[in-house]
Amino acid sequence: PFPDGHPGLRDEVRVPGVMTSRSEATVRNELGREYACIENIDDQVGLVVEKLKKMGELENTYIIYTADHGIAVGRHGLMGKQNLYEHSWRVPFIVSGPGIKSGTRAKGNNYLLDILPPVCDLAGIAIPKTVQGKSLKPVLEGEKEQIRNVLYGAYCGGTKPGMRSVRKGDWKLIKYDTMDGTVRRTQLFNLKENPHELLIEHQAKDVIAKTGNSPRKKQVNLAVNPQYKDELKEMEELLLSEMKRLNDPYRFWDQPFK
C-alpha cells in the first residue's frame, strides 16, 4: 500500500528467480506454489504419522508443526515477508501428543522461543537456565488459555528504525519509520473486527469489483479515527514500554528517548 522501507532490496524486483512483478498472473502463480507447499507438507506429516503407527509409537510421540514466518504473496500489495501484518507475522503452531486434547484451540500468544521449554517439560527434562522462553505446557494441557498477553514484533530491514508492532488482546499497533524518514505511518487494528488488517485501499470500487469482497466500515486503519484515541494511546504506550524492556536502540519520530 506504500513503500514501507526496503530500498536496498525489493524482493520482487532485485532478487533473481523470485518474483518479477505484482501482476495478477504473478500473484496467482505464487499462490499456487504456496498451496502446493501446504499440500506437500500435509503429505509429509502423513508419512511420519503412518510410520509412527507402524512402530507402535504414535501414542507416545509429540508432533509439533510450526514455521519461522509467513509471506504476503499479494496481500496488502506486498510479495515477501518484509512486514508485520498477520499473514507474515503470525505462524502456525499445531501440537498433538499424550495429554493434549484433539480438536481444541487456544487463543493465547507465544513466541517461537516458547517451544523448547514445553518440550523439556513434556519429556521430563530440566529446562536449561539459558532459555528465555516460557513453557506452554499449561496451555497445551488445557490448564491455561495463554502464558503471554502481549506480543512484540520488529522488522529492521532497510533504513532504521524500520517497523515495530505490539499486540494485546484484539488490538494491534504497527508503526513505520522507513525510507530515511520519508515514510512514517501508524496503524491500529481491532483483529476481532478486522482479522485481515484491511485498509481503506481495500474499499476502493475497483478492488471490490476484482475481489468480490466488500469490507465493513470498521475494517480500516483505526489510528486516524478520533473515536479510538484511547485505544491508540494505550497501544502506543505499550509499544514504547516493550521497546524499552527489550533494549530497542531505536525510537520513532513521536516517541521520547528517555
Question: What is each of the regions a protein language model found here?
Answer:
Residues 1-113, 122-130, 175, 179-183, ...:
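Active-site-proximal cap/lid insertion segments
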Residues 65-71, 77-79, 132, 154-158, ...:
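Short, solvent-exposed turn/loop segments enriched in Gly/Ser/Thr/Pro and often Arg
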Residues 71-74, 143-147:
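Secretory-pathway/luminal and periplasmic proteins that interact with or process carbohydrate-rich
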Residues 90, 111-122, 135, 139, ...:
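Generic recognition of well-ordered alpha-helical segments
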Residues 94, 163-165, 188:
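Conserved hydrophobic/aromatic beta-strand scaffold that supports enzyme active sites
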Residues 147-154:
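WW-domain-binding short linear motifs
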Residues 162-167, 172-177:
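Short, surface-exposed beta-strand/loop micro-motifs that present aromatic residues
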